[in-house]
Amino acid sequence: GRYDVDAIHMDDYFYPYPAAGMPFPDDNSFRKYGLRKGYSEAQRNDWRRENVNTLIRELKRTILLTKPWVRFGISPFGIYRNKKSTADGSGSNTNGLQNYDDLYADITYWVQQGWIDYNIPQIYWEIGHPAADYITLIKWWDKNANGGHLYIGQDVARTMKADQLTRKMRYERALPHVSGNCFWPANEILWNNKGVADSLKRNYHRYPALIPAYTHMHNRPPKDVSKLKTEWTPKGFLLHWQAEQSPTNPELASYFVVYRFNDKEPIDTSDPSKIVAITRETGYLMPYEKGKVKYRYVVTAVDRFHNESEGKTKKVKL
């Protein structure tokens, strides 16, 4: 509880990835704990899954008791179950390692139970991969999002090597339950591998984005900002406001979004191209343009759960 974090994140390591000819050595643990709980030898895999379930459930419970606004998420291996492994054919049309059967990680169950707040499956394969096709998998995860926050884990190097960034972005953006992407590893973006950063900035991430609200955790927006005013300061022409804030109350304003609209255009805060600042400050220095052009600035407040308030508007001549 000492650190001001937004989320606790776990990667894809639960039970270890299986190695050929090396069964996981948990005989003693199973005899001591599994058999005592009523599991038979034939149910050892169920016992393993319940062990991981307990870990995930208790982590979520502990986070809720400590800082209820902190999110808990997982980036699991990209295949939940292959179709051939499921009696009802509910698995994906893939042929690879499986979370449920090999790592004993029941991802979709965790989402259903509300134990994780977001899911980032690692869909690191290419479009057309013979065992794990990218399109097949993102469609499967979208269909099985179960109302949770779903993001797609992207392998930067493999995507750029196959020249598939444009196609992948187009496909995932067409799916109704996908909220965005997580690019791995970050240094490939920083190094601009094959122009990936340029392409993202130019084509897909041209404007700032707001984090989707975690309404299953808290669904009431904070109070609107008040006393929205302009003032000349030694640093320039300042737009400033007041808001109710507290570091110990996640339902109050945590940060603010500043939008700018031309004088006659309709105000639409769902348009990200109008965002000029996302800030934790209660002021924004506006670019002064000889005082002849009319604009309308809109300021909203956002809480720790990313619920956004209604906007307050100020007409300004710049």
Enumerate the language-model features and the residues they cover:
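Core-facing hydrophobic residues within beta-strands of well-ordered domains
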Residues: V5, I116, V178, P222-V225, ...
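Substrate-binding cleft of secreted/luminal carbohydrate-active enzymes
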Residues: Y104-P130, I138, A145-H218
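Coil residues (strongly favoring Ser/Thr
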Residues: S199, T269-P272
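Pro/Thr/Ser/Gly-rich low-complexity, intrinsically disordered linker/stalk tracts
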Residues: S199-P250, H306-L318
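Beta-strand-rich modules
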Residues: M286-E308
